[in-house]
From Swiss-Prot:
Keywords: Disulfide bond, Plant defense, Secreted, Signal, Toxin. GO terms for cellular component: extracellular region. It comes from Triticum aestivum. Residues 73-136 form a propeptide. InterPro entries: Thionin, Thionin-like_sf. Its main location: secreted. This is Purothionin A-1. It holds the Pfam family Thionin. The keyword NAD does not apply. PANTHER family: ALPHA-2-PUROTHIONIN, THIONIN-2.1-RELATED.
Length: 136
């Protein structure tokens, strides 16, 4: 990899680091029952997450799954997770990968950059940012 390519990868990693720092974690609530889930959803119309979780006997989590005794997973009402993932991937690829591709010296290097940058964007948008790497 030439110095141009290395500079491009470094810039990408720096930008991803800045984006990661600004990502807001979307809260998820886990409730023991459908009744608890409905209680939480109604409460959230006016109440704070922590208050509603306590009143309705739910737990707040930032993970992808709920504890076994809290099986009902609820995304916040303003969440549209599949669209969010799609737009995250699209934005990441268009802003970061385009820059890196322009730094490629030849077609072979460009294909490698496109693949690695695309994989990094997928990992980032699926919350696997700790696993994201552009190294071959």
């Amino acid at each position: 990899m030439g110095s141009k390519g290395l500079k491009g990868v470094m810039v990408c990693l720096l930008i991803l680091g800045l984006v990661l720092e600004q990502v807001q974690v979307e809260g998820k609530s886990c409730c023991k029952s459908t009744l608890g889930r409905n209680c939480y959803n109604l409460c959230r119309a006016r109440g704070a997450q922590k208050l509603c979780a306590n009143v309705c006997r739910c737990k707040l989590t930032s993970g992808l799954s709920c504890p076994k005794d809290f099986p009902k997973l609820v995304l916040e009402s303003n969440s549209d997770e599949p669209d969010t993932m799609e737009y995250c991937n699209l934005g990441c690829r268009s802003s970061l990968c385009d820059y890196i591709v322009n730094a490629a010296a030849d077609d072979e290097e460009m294909k490698l950059y496109v693949e690695q940058c695309g994989d990094a964007c997928v990992n980032f948008c699926n919350a696997d940012a700790g696993l994201t790497s552009l190294d071959a």
